[in-house]
Swiss-Prot record:
It comes from Fervidobacterium nodosum (strain ATCC 35602 / DSM 5306 / Rt17-B1). ATP binds at residues 9, 57, 85, 91, 102, 112. Its main location: cytoplasm. This is Nucleoside diphosphate kinase. Its cofactor is Mg(2+).
């Protein structure tokens, strides 16, 4: 099994889309093994987006991520990283596939509802900002045999 990390951004929370987004993952057989509702600290935001420091959009992105609560999630499934990125859609909502989360609901590149890790290394780095190993729960889905 493979894992990945996503953050439902402040606009996903404010627009009442948390349940809809999580449902899309669960309907595909993706298991939620970590889930937190929180207000991101500046330190967490700076660590998360450290690779983008110095880029034109960095300050705006940080301020947006600090503007309200977020939902941090660790997901698990076979080929999880690839599957989640397909469900999420392209970063730019105008380039996102119809039916993807961003293609259906996102407004702008910054306010695109969801952050998703783009590699296993980034999953490890990003998820460790929000979760300790003891906060990741392993369990068996009733439908797991069908996946």
């Amino acid at each position: 099994m493979e894992r990945t990390f996503v953050i439902l951004k402040p606009n996903a929370v404010r627009r009442g889309l948390v349940g809809e987004i999580l449902k899309r993952f669960e309907q595909r057989g993706i298991k939620i093994v970590g889930l937190k509702f929180l207000k991101m600290t500046r330190e967490q935001a700076e660590k998360l987006y450290e690779p983008h420091k110095g880029k034109q959009f960095y300050d705006e992105l940080l301020e947006f991520m600090l503007s309200g609560p977020i939902v941090a999630v660790i997901l698990e499934a076979p080929r999880c990283l690839e599957l989640v990125r397909h469900i999420v859609g392209a970063t730019d909502p105008l380039k996102a596939e119809a039916g993807s989360i961003r293609g259906e609901f996102a407004l702008t590149v910054t306010k695109n509802l969801i952050h998703a890790s783009d590699s296993t290394d980034n999953f490890i780095r990003e998820s460790s900002i929000f979760f300790s190993p003891s906060e990741i729960i392993d369990y068996y889905l009733d439908v797991q045999d069908d996946i």
